[in-house]
Amino acid sequence: MKVELCSFSGYKIYPGHGRRYARVDGKVFQFLNAKCESAFLSKRNPRQINWTVLYRRKHKKGQSEEVSKKRTRRAVKFQRAITGASLAEILAKRNQKPEVRKAQREQAIRAAKEAKKAKQATKKQTTQSSKAPAKSAQKQKIAKPMKVSAPRVGGKR
């Protein structure tokens, strides 16, 4: 049994019922009854007519028992350890007072500067000790005679 849908009202049309309307452009419409057909031909909007399925869908009639509100999944904050720092360390750092944090930062900067100075001092000592014997061993460079080309005469053109 082939059940069709009314092109205007959206109701089911059972075999032996309804009317078929074929437009000049070849499009075929099925109507439940003359009421639907006349409303369609007078170009009425089925969304604005109370008894049509489209109106009921638009104004959410008779759907409340079928569809319960969809639950959306919320993102939940979750704390976990990061590589190189355990969760306890992270929480301890977060709970520190700003003064303590500032003092630690300054101390770390001071230590880094001292390490840099020490490194530069050792570098200087090594360069001085290696340069001293090298100076006496150096010979004076002899200036090479440069070839002087003949002066150019005339312009480019």
UniProtKB/Swiss-Prot annotation:
* Basic and acidic residues: compositionally biased ranges: 96-117
Asked whether the UniProt record includes Cytoplasm among its keywords, one would answer: yes
> Which Gene3D superfamilies does this entry report, sorted A to Z?
6.10.250.1270, Ribosomal protein L24e (2.30.170.20)
Q: Where is the composition biased (Low complexity)?
A: 123-145
Keywords (alphabetical) are: Cytoplasm, Developmental protein, Ribonucleoprotein, Ribosomal protein
Q: Name one Pfam family in it.
A: Ribosomal_L24e
Q: Which domain of life is it from?
A: Eukaryota
- Region entry Disordered: which residue ranges? 95-157
**After gene disruption, what is the outcome?**
Embryos show various defects including smaller head and eyes.
Check the record and name the SUPFAM superfamilies matching this protein: Glucocorticoid receptor-like (DNA-binding domain) (SSF57716)
Compartments, record wording: Cytoplasm
- What does the record give under GO molecular function? mRNA binding; structural constituent of ribosome
Record GO cellular component, one term? cytosolic large ribosomal subunit
Q: Which GO terms describe its biological process?
A: chordate embryonic development; cytoplasmic translation
Quaternary structure and partners? Component of the large ribosomal subunit.
Reported function? Component of the large ribosomal subunit. The ribosome is a large ribonucleoprotein complex responsible for the synthesis of proteins in the cell. Plays an essential role in early embryonic development.
State the family it belongs to. Answer: Belongs to the eukaryotic ribosomal protein eL24 family.
State the protein's name. Large ribosomal subunit protein eL24
Q: To which species is this protein native?
A: Danio rerio
